[in-house]
């Protein structure tokens, strides 16, 4: 779009709580960032939520959508039978140029499918992929893919690395992000056949700081800025880290509230605990960007709270302002020859 202010289409009906969480979260993002909202969904339900909120300085439009993509519905059914579903309408706004990006906490499979078939893919990209931001001892690390593609060929992993590197440049504000390939050992020859072939492609990539193989423990050390893997491995790693963080938090809380000395120590260290809680809070980033589409798309968890929605909408606006989509296009185009070579190699 030519408009200098990012315009973000928000699927107001998505998520476990629909407009009651999504609308306040989106409005919060619009107040905290320079962007315009297009709230997509049931007009009456959206208006009812807006009437409860302070809207001074908030630029927004409402686009009515009569249908909702159910969380348990098949993405293919939603694409074929629910043309007026809020997520479909939001994606069409991006395709038509009326919006720069979409944010949805609804059916993630439907969001991915609608993004691919309505918004379309960046020329040369075969598999759009979901990125997740992982907290580390230093700066965050971008993990890609975390669930959009469970079966991948080597050149898919190669393209994931290209897209994640361009994305990390804007997100982490690092000129040359360090890109690692997740494997079972750091040595060059480690990994299955797909990983080994992807290694060779990434090593030859233009303008990519490829540091070689990394292991699972490297996800949290901060020694790489980008970790590349297929969606099966990435989703397992993501859910494992989320589960571990939740379990450790519960264990820590239980131990810190046992006995008067522990309670006093907890009180004295409360600021440190608050910083740690923010550090591991998924709501700080809000959602997983779906990279490889012709536009910005952020997929949020169905259980997202207001803060998570606000973070996701704000992130979408930031990526529009920074030209992240164009950076992805440039990176993919610069490595088109290697991608073609990877496709030609017998899989």
From Swiss-Prot:
Pfam families per UniProt: FA_synthesis
Q: What is its EC number?
A: 2.3.1.274
| Main localisation | cytoplasm
Source superkingdom = Bacteria
Q: Which reaction does it catalyse?
A: a fatty acyl-[ACP] + phosphate = an acyl phosphate + holo-[ACP]
Cellular component GO terms held in the UniProt record: cytoplasm
Query: Which GO MF terms does the UniProt record name?
Result: phosphate:acyl-[acyl carrier protein] acyltransferase activity
Gene3D superfamilies to which the protein is assigned, alphabetical: Isopropylmalate Dehydrogenase (3.40.718.10)
Keywords recorded for this protein, A-Z:
Cytoplasm, Lipid biosynthesis, Lipid metabolism, Phospholipid biosynthesis, Phospholipid metabolism, Transferase
An example Gene Ontology biological process = phospholipid biosynthetic process
Which pathway is it part of? Lipid metabolism; phospholipid metabolism
From the Swiss-Prot or TrEMBL record, state where the protein is found. Answer: Cytoplasm
Q: Which InterPro entries match?
A: FA_synthesis, Phospholipid_synth_PlsX-like
Which EC main class describes this enzyme? Answer: transferase
| Function field | Catalyzes the reversible formation of acyl-phosphate (acyl-PO(4)) from acyl-[acyl-carrier-protein] (acyl-ACP). This enzyme utilizes acyl-ACP as fatty acyl donor, but not acyl-CoA.
Subunit info here reads: Homodimer. Probably interacts with PlsY.
Family the entry assigns: Belongs to the PlsX family.
Protein name, UniProt field? Phosphate acyltransferase
* Organism whose genome encodes this protein: Oleidesulfovibrio alaskensis (strain ATCC BAA-1058 / DSM 17464 / G20)
List the lineage, top down: Bacteria, Pseudomonadati, Thermodesulfobacteriota, Desulfovibrionia, Desulfovibrionales
């Amino acid at each position: 779009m030519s408009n200098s202010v990012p315009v973000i289409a928000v699927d107001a009906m998505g998520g476990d709580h629909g407009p009651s969480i999504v609308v306040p979260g989106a409005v919060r993002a619009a107040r905290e960032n320079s962007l315009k909202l297009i709230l997509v969904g049931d007009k009456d339900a959206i208006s009812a939520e807006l009437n409860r909120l302070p809207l001074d300085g908030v630029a927004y439009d409402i686009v009515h959508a009569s249908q909702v993509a159910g969380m348990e519905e098949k993405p293919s059914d939603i694409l074929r039978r629910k043309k007026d579903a809020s997520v479909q309408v939001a994606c069409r706004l991006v395709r038509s140029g009326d919006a720069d990006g979409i944010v949805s906490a609804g059916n993630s499979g439907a969001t991915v499918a609608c993004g691919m078939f309505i918004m379309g893919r960046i020329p040369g990209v075969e598999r759009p992929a979901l990125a997740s931001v992982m907290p580390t001892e230093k700066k965050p690390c971008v993990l890609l893919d975390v669930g959009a593609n469970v079966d991948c060929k080597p050149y898919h992993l190669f393209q994931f690395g290209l897209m994640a590197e361009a994305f990390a440049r804007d997100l982490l504000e690092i000129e040359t992000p360090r890109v690692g390939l997740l494997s079972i050992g750091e040595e060059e020859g480690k990994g299955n056949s797909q990983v080994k072939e992807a290694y060779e492609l990434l090593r030859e990539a233009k303008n990519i700081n490829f540091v070689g193989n990394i292991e699972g423990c490297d996800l949290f050390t901060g020694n790489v800025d980008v970790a590349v893997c297929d969606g099966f491995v990435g989703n397992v790693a993501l859910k494992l880290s989320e589960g571990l963080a939740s379990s450790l938090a519960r264990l820590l809380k239980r131990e810190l509230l046992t006995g008067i000395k522990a309670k006093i120590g907890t009180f004295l260290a409360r600021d440190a605990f608050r910083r740690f809680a923010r550090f591991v809070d998924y709501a700080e980033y809000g959602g997983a960007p779906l990279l490889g589409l012709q536009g910005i798309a952020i997929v949020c968890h169905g259980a997202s709270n207001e803060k998570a929605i606000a973070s996701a909408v704000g992130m979408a606006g930031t990526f529009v302002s920074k030209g992240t989509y164009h950076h992805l296009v440039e990176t993919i185009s610069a490595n088109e020859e290697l991608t073609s070579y990877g496709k030609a190699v017998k899989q």
